[in-house]
Amino acid sequence: KWSSKSPGNYDYPAPQGREAVISEVEQAQEEEEEEASVEFALSSDIEDDYEPELLLVPEGQPVNQPMLAAAQSLHREATKWSSKGNDIIAAAKRMALLMAEMSRLVRGGSGNKRALIQCAKDIAKASDEVTKLAKEVAKQCTDKRIRTNLLQVCERIPTISTQLKILSTVKATMLGRTNISDEESEQATEMLVHNAQNLMQSVKETVREAEAASIKIRTDAGFTLRWARKTPWYQ
């Protein structure tokens, strides 16, 4: 289950126009730095057995939810493997759940500004972990082609996750506002969704390439990730 501190509410004035949005983005970024860290994460001991409700499409909601679909796609890829002894898989699963939470915050229209910004920060933190571990796997991989492929996909992640934090802050300032046009709000949502899709796809590809690279690591290298396939429930 998700755990967080009470996020509270921003008490913004209601200026008009695009300059107001930019001003609020800057204010939100300043205030978020002062906030204590809040984590949307699962305990690692239940991660493997947890079937998250956040990744299900609620009744009455449209099926076409691209951000949630991207989270589901990454989660399906990550849950092929046990996260025990594999921090890349554990971080990828956290990212999928966090992205599903972000989808809920954005989709519902009732999301809390601070919760959305914090969720983006937590996603960025998990993505940094994936990138760091993937680079270590690449460093130890003896196959040049596989090593190059892994580095190419994982090195995209930091830039995309940084963009996610910025776009989430922009979108957060619009939540609950009545003086933002539908066009501006929709544009901000579309940019955020597109970024989320790119991030989930990059992490998904990183998981696949890291597994391939792990096979090409010398046993005496001193660095290992445990890649244990999970047995499907129907077997």
From Swiss-Prot:
Keywords, comma-separated and alphabetical: Actin-binding, Cell adhesion, Cell junction, Cell membrane, Cell projection, Cytoplasm, Cytoskeleton, Lipoprotein, Membrane, Phosphoprotein, Repeat
Sample GO molecular function, one term: actin filament binding
Stored Gene3D superfamilies: Alpha-catenin/vinculin-like
Cell compartments where the protein resides: Cell membrane; Cell junction, Adherens junction; Cell junction, Focal adhesion; Cytoplasm, Cytoskeleton
A GO CC term assigned to this protein in UniProt: cytoplasm
Record membrane topology: Peripheral membrane protein
PTM field: Phosphorylated on serines, threonines and tyrosines.
Gene Ontology BP terms: cell adhesion
The keyword Lipoprotein belongs to this UniProt entry's keyword annotation: yes
Pfam families, per the entry: Vinculin (PF01044)
Role this protein plays: Involved in cell adhesion. May be involved in the attachment of the actin-based microfilaments to the plasma membrane.
Family membership: Belongs to the vinculin/alpha-catenin family.
Subunit record text: Exhibits self-association properties.
Entry protein name: Vinculin
